[in-house]
Design a protein with these regions (language model features):
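Metabolite-binding pocket within alpha/beta catalytic cores that recognizes anionic/polar moieties
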Residues: 1-133
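Short, conserved beta-strand edge motifs with alternating hydrophobic and charged residues
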Residues: 86, 105, 147-154, 178
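Glycine-rich beta-alpha junction loops
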Residues: 23, 91, 152-157, 183
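Short glycine-/small-residue-rich flexible loop motifs, especially phosphate/cofactor-binding loops
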Residues: 47, 73, 136, 166, ...
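Active-site rim beta-loop-alpha module in soluble metabolic enzymes
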Residues: 125-173
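Acidic, His- and aromatic-enriched active-site or binding-groove loops in soluble protein domains
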Residues: 108-113, 169, 174-177
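Short glycine-rich, acidic/polar surface loops and turns
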Residues: 178-186
């Protein structure tokens, strides 16, 4: 059945997805794929398919925040996608994390609203260990500079307590801040 927001259905037969937030990032992803085909564009959800090293891959933008990312992942699940990797940016909370370096997230502080709609707040937001391990190995193979650990998922980009909140989580060893990971991991 065609999904309401991503406008895709199970006839795609794709099991793997890459999820940037920004629809414009799909152009950069498309440059790495073969046999690229634009699929749909509805609201923040732009999609394309292609092949990477012989494997069919779907790229789907999710917009900003856990609510829209949650919609994307639920609808991807409905059409048979079994693994998704979120790519994008985060605000670094630790010195020594440089632009372009990878933050590989093991878990998220659930300071958002979207993740709490799925499970109670006491439930941890943690990565799938198998998929996480694949990401670590791929990063090593590429020679990427990586930082592994926890991120802080929050609800709002701009609010008065943001600076104090960032300092607090930085002292706790949290690597970065975003708005999606907690929802995606629950």
């Amino acid at each position: 059945m065609k999904q309401a927001h991503i406008c895709l259905d199970e006839t795609l037969g794709i099991r793997y997805a890459i999820l940037p937030g920004d629809p414009a990032r799909l152009d950069r992803i498309a440059a790495k794929l073969e046999d690229v085909q634009e699929l749909a564009y509805n609201r923040e959800f732009r999609s394309l398919r292609g092949r990477y090293k012989g494997v069919d891959v779907l790229a789907l933008s999710t917009g900003i925040g856990g609510s829209s990312a949650g919609i994307a992942v639920e609808e991807l699940h409905n059409i048979g996608v079994q693994a998704a990797i979120r790519i994008g940016s985060c605000g670094a909370l630790q010195k020594g994390i440089g632009l372009g370096e990878l933050v590989l997230v093991t878990g998220a502080v659930r300071d958002d609203g979207a993740s709490k709609a799925y499970v109670p707040a006491i439930y941890p937001a943690v990565a799938d260990f198998t998929l996480y391990g694949c990401c670590v190995e791929a990063a090593k193979t590429l020679g990427a500079v990586t930082h592994e650990g926890i991120c802080h998922s929050h609800e709002s980009f701009y609010h008065e307590e943001n600076e104090a909140e960032s300092a607090y989580w930085s002292k706790k060893g949290v690597l970065g801040a975003d708005m999606e990971t907690a929802a995606l991991f629950t």
